[in-house]
Swiss-Prot record:
Keyword hit for Zinc: no
Membrane topology category: Peripheral membrane protein
GO molecular function, one term: metal ion binding
Modified residues (N6-acetyllysine): 66, 199, 250
CC annotations in GO: mitochondrial inner membrane; mitochondrion; nucleoplasm; respiratory chain complex III
Keywords of the record: Acetylation, Disease variant, Electron transport, Membrane, Mitochondrion, Mitochondrion inner membrane, Primary mitochondrial disease, Respiratory chain, Transit peptide, Transport
Transit peptide interval: 1-14
InterPro entries linked to this entry: Metalloenz_LuxS/M16, MPP/UQCRC_Complex, Pept_M16_N, Pept_M16_Zn_BS, Peptidase_M16_C
Gene Ontology BP, a term: mitochondrial electron transport, ubiquinol to cytochrome c
Protein's name in the database: Cytochrome b-c1 complex subunit 2, mitochondrial
Subunit structure: Component of the ubiquinol-cytochrome c oxidoreductase (cytochrome b-c1 complex, complex III, CIII), a multisubunit enzyme composed of 11 subunits. The complex is composed of 3 respiratory subunits cytochrome b, cytochrome c1 and Rieske protein UQCRFS1, 2 core protein subunits UQCRC1/QCR1 and UQCRC2/QCR2, and 6 low-molecular weight protein subunits UQCRH/QCR6, UQCRB/QCR7, UQCRQ/QCR8, UQCR10/QCR9, UQCR11/QCR10 and subunit 9, the cleavage product of Rieske protein UQCRFS1.
Length: 453
């Protein structure tokens, strides 16, 4: 496969085969080409391949893997955080310098992101250079070496990465919220615990990759590439680890509370209960409920005064605040509730007023106008998100890992429209009656404990 000189091959990667050129379909001459339909293939080993030839000047390929932090255990916490930083380390087929310089030379980009469920390795570049980036993507995900000295050099970056992320109090509160809500799996942090920084070893990285980066846990998604060629690459180079890998533990919701007292004048608080599994009809009801209550301002720098939560809290305090509904769905659980930011002295009034507003809906006080407006906001938000190629790639990859298929936007909109008022009221009732979890940070002298709510 071509490198900087356009004359290299995959001979160093796996010496048995030479990778085909990953070229996009040539655009027809004359009239502007029309994007093709999304093509989906599931190989016998469980690997899912999907592609959309949209004739964009930029090609994007993502390898999505069921290997998020939920698959760690108490002995290897922080492994996925370090994995996110190792994409430029030496592999069996390319040195660290070769990867970095090769991507840089063509103006490409290799990024690694992770959620509690999945990891995603994504490359993007001009469509004529996609074969170069594909080689590096395959090297990084299938043939890492994790040399001890290179891994050791990355350890301080864990601390910096975490410190930068935690400059936003919301990041820390959401991390604490999951730790309070679950006993295992989804309780695992996205960022390496402080006591593990400097202790994550190359052996732990190898073990995690060997047992979770298997074909049946992967989905290869491409935009602006040919499906037959992408399928050929997957069959040749992503078929080296069969089986399902290590199965992860089912998330066990318990309910709990984590309070972090500090000197901040603003109190950040998240107050939730267990909701619904991603992709279920009940999860759709919680999504509509989120937009009934208020999921954030729809006018840039707007005051969000049309939000039901905002209106309720505004009657309880004259001090500045922010409030929105919180909603997170996973493959075997979910969290729904309220996120508030307030002055320390008003924290109790803000949280209680927001909670009482959800109780009002649980009692059946819900108009058809509010429901239709919420559905419109939810549908518009979804459609606008998948207009972005980055978000579309992520959406297809996530669906491929969960269901092995793709649900088109038209079907998603139909499911949103099918949510009845009674479904939304039942979702509110489930939150009100459910075992609560809470995380808060700031000057918490006026912040109620979870059992006081």
């Amino acid at each position: 496969m071509k490198l900087l000189t356009r004359a290299g091959s995959f001979s160093r990667f796996y010496s048995l085969k030479v990778a085909p050129k990953v070229k996009a379909t040539a655009a027809p001459a004359g009239a502007p080409p029309q994007p093709q339909d999304l093509e989906f293939t599931k190989l016998p080993n469980g690997l899912v391949i999907a592609s959309l030839e949209n004739y964009s000047p930029v090609s994007r390929i993502g390898l999505f893997i069921k290997a998020g932090s939920r698959y760690e255990d108490f002995s290897n916490l922080g492994t996925t955080h370090l994995l996110r930083l190792t994409s430029s380390l030496t592999t069996k087929g390319a040195s660290s310098f070769k990867i970095t310089r090769g991507i840089e030379a063509v103006g490409g980009k290799l990024s690694v992101t992770a959620t509690r469920e999945n990891m995603a390795y994504t490359v993007e570049c001009l469509r004529g250079d996609v074969d170069i980036l594909m080689e590096f993507l395959l090297n990084v995900t299938t043939a890492p070496e994790f040399r001890r000295w290179e891994v050791a050099d990355l350890q301080p970056q864990l601390k910096i990465d975490k410190a930068v992320a935690f400059q936003n109090p919301q990041t820390h509160v959401i991390e604490n919220l999951h730790a309070a809500a679950y006993r295992n799996a989804l309780a695992n942090p996205l960022y390496c615990p402080d006591y593990r920084i400097g202790k994550v070893t190359s052996e732990e990285l190898h073990y995690f990759v060997q047992n979770h980066f298997t074909s049946a846990r992967m989905a290869l998604i491409g935009l602006g590439v040919s499906h037959p060629v992408l399928k050929q690459v997957a069959e040749q180079f992503l078929n080296m680890r069969g089986g399902l890998g290590l199965s992860g533990a089912k998330a066990n919701y318990r309910g709990g509370e984590i309070r972090e007292q500090n000197g901040d004048s603003l109190v950040h608080a998240a107050f939730v209960a267990e909701s619904a599994v991603a992709g279920s009809a009940e999860a759709n009801a919680f999504s509509v409920l989120q937009h009934v209550l208020g999921a954030g301002p729809h006018v840039k720098r707007g005051s969000n005064t049309t939000s039901h939560l905002h209106q309720a809290v505004a009657k309880a305090t004259q001090q500045p605040f922010d409030v929105s509904a919180f909603n997170a769905s996973y493959s075997d659980s979910g969290l729904f509730g309220i996120y508030t930011i307030s002055q320390a002295t008003a924290a109790g009034d803000v949280i209680k007023a927001a909670y009482n507003q959800v109780k009002t809906i649980a009692q059946g006080n819900l108009s058809n106008t509010d429901v239709q407006a919420a559905k419109n906001k939810l549908k518009a938000g979804y459609l606008m998100s998948v207009e972005s190629s980055e978000c579309f790639l992520e959406e297809v990859g996530s669906q491929a890992l969960v269901a092995g298929s793709y649900m088109p936007p038209s079907t998603v909109l139909q499911q949103i429209d099918s949510v009845a008022n009674a479904d939304i009221i039942n979702a509110a009732k489930k939150f009100v009656s459910g075992q609560k979890s809470m995380a808060a940070s700031g000057n918490l002298g006026h912040t109620p404990f979870v059992d006081e709510l």
